[in-house]
């Protein structure tokens, strides 16, 4: 079981931000198995029942690949599908909302925290609840930014379209006087430069990827499942449900190297 891989599941390319953090924080002997459901991205515009169904289909596919833990590298799934996943999958299942909320509570100065995410994530109130657990007196302001996902998927992360979209979405949050902004979708760190420039240097941006990676490492250590091998990254495997060449292009640019093992598959079969 120690030598089994770690599943990383997202609706598309955004989960590569979590993949990159896992590769940095975990021992080199760990093997990662990534699934991006690019045929059905974005998840944030779907109903909760649909998101849960998609989440279970993807998790079952990864479980068949012999994983030892599952990382839900998608805020929408983390917001609405974690209970169903933990009931269905007899493995450690880690989402991104809890670690991200805790990180935001550590860095906020005035306890006025903004959260941007998909419509489903913001509607769920999951971040507000998680932040209130750690910092009950905090004021949390949510803003859905659905167009950031297709911009990230297309690689339009630092151009005039991205900048205009950021200004349109984030102006109200700036006026609310937030001092911390949670990037509540794993696609959004791909637009971090534009978001940061829009918000200004006085607003701390919180990316849940590293915090999630540290939680995953701790969970594996607790269970004696952390690999001590010297190699593993060369065996990383990427699966997508559509547009594999587009994923290869954007993913290779973000990760700084080729995606050697990339397959297009059907998880509904």
Please give the residue ranges for each predicted region.
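Non-catalytic structural scaffold of enzyme domains
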Residues: 1-269
């Amino acid at each position: 079981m120690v030598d089994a891989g770690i599943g990383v599941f997202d609706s598309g390319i955004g989960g590569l931000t979590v993949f990159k953090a896992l590769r940095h924080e975990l021992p080199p002997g760990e093997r990662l198995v990534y699934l991006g459901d690019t045929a059905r991205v974005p998840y944030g515009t779907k109903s909760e029942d649909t998101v849960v169904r998609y989440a279970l289909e993807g998790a079952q596919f990864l479980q068949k690949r012999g994983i030892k833990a599952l990382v839900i590298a998608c805020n929408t799934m983390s917001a609405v599908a974690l209970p169903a996943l933990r009931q269905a999958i007899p493995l450690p299942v880690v989402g991104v909302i809890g670690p991200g909320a805790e990180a935001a509570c550590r860095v906020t100065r005035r306890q006025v925290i903004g959260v941007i995410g998909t419509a489903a994530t913001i509607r769920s109130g999951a971040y507000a609840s998680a932040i209130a657990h750690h910092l009950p007196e905090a004021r949390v302001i949510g803003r859905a930014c659905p167009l950031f996902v297709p911009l990230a998927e297309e690689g339009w992360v630092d151009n005039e379209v991205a900048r205009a979209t950021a200004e349109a979405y984030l102006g109200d949050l700036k006026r609310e006087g937030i001092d911390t902004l949670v990037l509540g979708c794993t696609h959004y760190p791909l637009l971090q430069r534009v978001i940061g420039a829009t918000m200004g240097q006085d607003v701390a941006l919180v990316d849940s990827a590293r915090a999630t990676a540290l939680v995953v490492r701790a969970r594996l250590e607790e269970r004696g499942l952390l690999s001590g091998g010297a190699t593993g990254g060369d065996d990383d495997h990427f699966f997508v449900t559509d547009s594999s060449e587009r994923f290869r292009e954007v993913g290779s640019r973000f990760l700084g190297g080729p995606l050697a093992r990339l397959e297009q598959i059907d998880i509904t079969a």
